Amino acid sequence: MTDDFAPDGQLAKAIPGFKPREPQRQMAVAVTQAIEKGQPLVVEAGTGTGKTYAYLAPALRAKKKVIISTGSKALQDQLYSRDLPTVSKALKYTGNVALLKGRSNYLCLERLEQQALAGGDLPVQILSDVILLRSWSNQTVDGDISTCVSVAEDSQAWPLVTSTNDNCLGSDCPMYKDCFVVKARKKAMDADVVVVNHHLFLADMVVKESGFGELIPEADVMIFDEAHQLPDIASQYFGQSLSSRQLLDLAKDITCLLYTSPSPRDTR
C-alpha cells in the first residue's frame, strides 16, 4: 500500500503535482492495517496531511464493501465528484461507486407533476420554477437537486417537489419505477463504495432500530471523515431536549392547576 504514496508510486504517476508526504503515508499504512485486521482506528491529522487520499487508497485497494461518511453534503459531493474519481483512476479501480443522500435531496416526480397540474394556484415565481424543474426532470440522470442550476437553492418550489417520509407514497406511487430515491438506494446496494453523510448514516441507524428496513447497505469497512462532528449530530437523532419554551409552558400548566384544583379541605 505504501508504494502508492512513494515518489514513483501510482498516485505520483497519475496525479499531476502530487507530492508524497510522510504523515500521509503513515496514515495510509495505519488505515491499511486497520482494514486488514478488522480493527477500529481513530486518526487526527493536521491540515495539509492529505487525509482524504490516505484513507481512499487503502479503501479501494481492500476490494471490500466500503461506506464513507462525510460531515456535510458539500464534502460528500466533493469527495464523490473530485477526490474519489481521481484516486480511482490513479489506482485503476474497477469497482462500482455510488452517492447516496436523504430523500429530500432528490426530485419527486409525482409531487412535481401535482404542482404542475395546480399551476394556476401557484405564485408566479414558484410556477416559473416548477416549469423549469419539469424541463430539468427530463435531463437529469439522478434527480439530485444540488445539480440543478436553473432554480435557486432557496426557491420556495423545492419543498413542493421533494418528498418526506410522511408524504411519500412508496410503492403505491404511480412514478415508483422512475423514482430517483429508489434508484439511488438500489445503486448504493449494488455498489462497492458508497459515499453518504453523517446525517443519513445516523438516520439509517434509527430506521434499522425500528425494524422498518434500511437506508444504507451493510458494509465491511466504515470510514467517517470529520468524525468529530458525530456526537453533536447523533444527539439530534438519539438525544432528548427540553427548550425554554417547553419549560415555560409546563410552569404555566402547573400554575393553572394549582389555582383551579380544589384544596384538600374543600374535598372533605
At which residue positions do the language-model features occur?
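SF2 helicase catalytic motif II
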Residues: E218-D232
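Walker A/P-loop NTP-binding motif
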Residues: Y53-K64, P85
